């Protein structure tokens, strides 16, 4: 696989850019292909996406090229699939050993949005992927080790349960998959709904961070409030707090929860990136940084929906 990674890293990138109507990367017009959709997990979640209304337009499997699966044409390569379907997004269900190669194949084909669900990709492989991603500007990676992205009632790319989502006004970004679903459920129950929900994943080396999502949500007219779910490890939340201080919209309230307050230093808590190291990455530091940026930081995930509703009500938006 690493030889394949090296090969893709030498691919040049043209100035052509696929057009998209999406404000936060996906909408009803997003055309999606799948890598690894003929496997058990890929088949299940692709079927769910089709039933949700996502425009799935094809799949990639070199060994099954020329056949169909779930009514979708299967192609030998991502490049071939893009040319035939005009896809502007791909979802990756490839096992860990081949996932980095799958990401880089999509980068080489200049797919605008790459969503990698796969968990357990070797960090060495992701370091290489991240380095290559920085050298181009045609593709965006969400993940890996994430639930994906969904614009309720329009497009679902990933493994999240579609039925708990409701079209609405809250943008949600999270490092945790299950806590994402909790925030979705609560904002649905309070009648706020969601504009777009992005699971950025819990690995140390991911493609899309909090700031990327905050920037999109801040500039998205449909998004009127933001929920941000972080966890211990790294400095992504502190960086997001600094961004909010400079560029945040005071008319778009932000609620946050940080998981892992009781975690001991040096012990990984679930995600590969959820570890306090060298005195950095503590929940306390993250909560203080976000609070100083005007974010309402809640003590438990059970308070996310209520806090968001109260802030929206105070702003005359609920």
From Swiss-Prot:
It catalyses: succinate + ATP + CoA = succinyl-CoA + ADP + phosphate. Succinyl-CoA synthetase functions in the citric acid cycle (TCA), coupling the hydrolysis of succinyl-CoA to the synthesis of ATP and thus represents the only step of substrate-level phosphorylation in the TCA. The alpha subunit of the enzyme binds the substrates coenzyme A and phosphate, while succinate binding and nucleotide specificity is provided by the beta subunit. InterPro entries: Cit_synth/succinyl-CoA_lig_AS, Citrt_syn/SCS-alpha_CS, CoA-bd, CoA_lig_alpha, NAD(P)-bd_dom_sf, SUCC_ACL_C, Succinyl-CoA_synth-like. CoA binds at residues 38-41, 64, 117-119. PANTHER family: SUCCINATE--COA LIGASE [ADP_GDP-FORMING] SUBUNIT ALPHA, MITOCHONDRIAL (PTHR11117:SF2), SUCCINYL-COA LIGASE SUBUNIT ALPHA (PTHR11117). Pfam families: CoA_binding, Ligase_CoA. Its EC number is 6.2.1.5. GO terms for biological process: tricarboxylic acid cycle. This is Succinate--CoA ligase [ADP-forming] subunit alpha. Pathway: Carbohydrate metabolism; tricarboxylic acid cycle; succinate from succinyl-CoA (ligase route): step 1/1. The active site is at 271 (tele-phosphohistidine intermediate). Belongs to the succinate/malate CoA ligase alpha subunit family.
